[in-house]
């Protein structure tokens, strides 16, 4: 399956896809096994799987007639970098505020 680049934030914007990632964090599953957890058609589940694959969150391995889905750690790097950036941003801001408040209380 050819992998297209998809915005990872858009990919995780759907609650069904986030739940699929949670399920796959426990074990690799076939698309049919994933579909059993949702009140949607198998083609709809396949569409969500394709989006997660295109965003790099999962890998798909064909084994006979079944397609096995697994999490792909590399797919989460962009999200982690974005979160780390803003985590550092807020830590710096809060440290400055803390320093300022401590200065004022010492006066």
Task: Please provide the spans of the model-predicted regions.
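Residues within the DNA-recognition helix of helix-turn-helix
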Residues: 48
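Pre-recognition alpha-helix immediately N-terminal to the DNA-recognition helix
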Residues: 18-20
């Amino acid at each position: 399956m050819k992998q297209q680049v998809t915005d990872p934030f858009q990919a995780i914007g759907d609650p069904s896809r986030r739940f699929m990632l949670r399920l796959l964090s426990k074990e690799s599953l076939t698309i049919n096994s994933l579909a059993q957890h949702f009140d949607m058609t198998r083609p709809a589940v396949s569409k969500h799987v394709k989006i997660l694959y295109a965003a790099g969150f999962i890998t798909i391995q064909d084994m006979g007639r079944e397609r096995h889905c697994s999490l792909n750690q590399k797919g989460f790097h962009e999200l982690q970098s974005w979160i780390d950036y803003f985590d550092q941003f807020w830590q710096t801001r809060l440290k400055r505020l803390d320093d300022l408040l401590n200065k004022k209380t010492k006066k």
